[in-house]
């Protein structure tokens, strides 16, 4: 009986192990197509505490958007030949964190496949257009001083000198600071012998200094 107990205790940890799904990654063997992935992170700090709202997201061809906390963040991919498959968001006091990402080609349809010519155009012309729109009634932001109405800042366009090679960003009147990060990578890079170099772009209004972007707490919306 004691021997049986020892055997069961030895086998118990293995009985709870979960194996990863076996995906067919032969799609990466295609000689005339490349499979590129994309991740876009946006961190936006508003000028007042966030409203309690339900997260809503939409994914469309070459772009996606998410709304939460009184802010809508939309991302459009121009000349990138890429699509998003997931959208996530996390809020904390006065800040919205959003993530837009694609999935590996062996896990989802449609795939982000492109020809070599498309890849060249991507590296030269891809624009990640990020637009932050406030969903708070603008009439609430008017203030009266000596019976004169003071108009809020309608739109704040980021100076071109601060924009990276891929990111173009425009924020609405309620946004104080924005940080954005873009990564375009070879989804088959860990499988094939020669991978395509990763493209990265980073932008922040925080004195141009890189900041750590919160990623782990972002949940799918």
Swiss-Prot record:
Q: Which Gene3D superfamilies match?
A: Major secreted virus protein
Question: What induces this protein's gene, according to its Swiss-Prot or TrEMBL record?
Answer: Expressed in the early phase of the viral replicative cycle.
Q: Per the record's keyword annotation, is DNA-binding included, yes or no?
A: no
Q: Which residues are glycosylated?
A: 72
Where is the protein localized?
Secreted
Q: Which Pfam families is this protein grouped with? A: Orthopox_35kD
Main function:
May interact with several cellular chemokines to interfere with chemokine-glycosaminoglycan (GAG) interactions at the cell surface to alter chemotaxis of nearby responsive cells.
> Which protein, by its recorded name, is this?
Protein OPG170
Q: What is the lineage of its organism?
A: Viruses, Varidnaviria, Bamfordvirae, Nucleocytoviricota, Pokkesviricetes
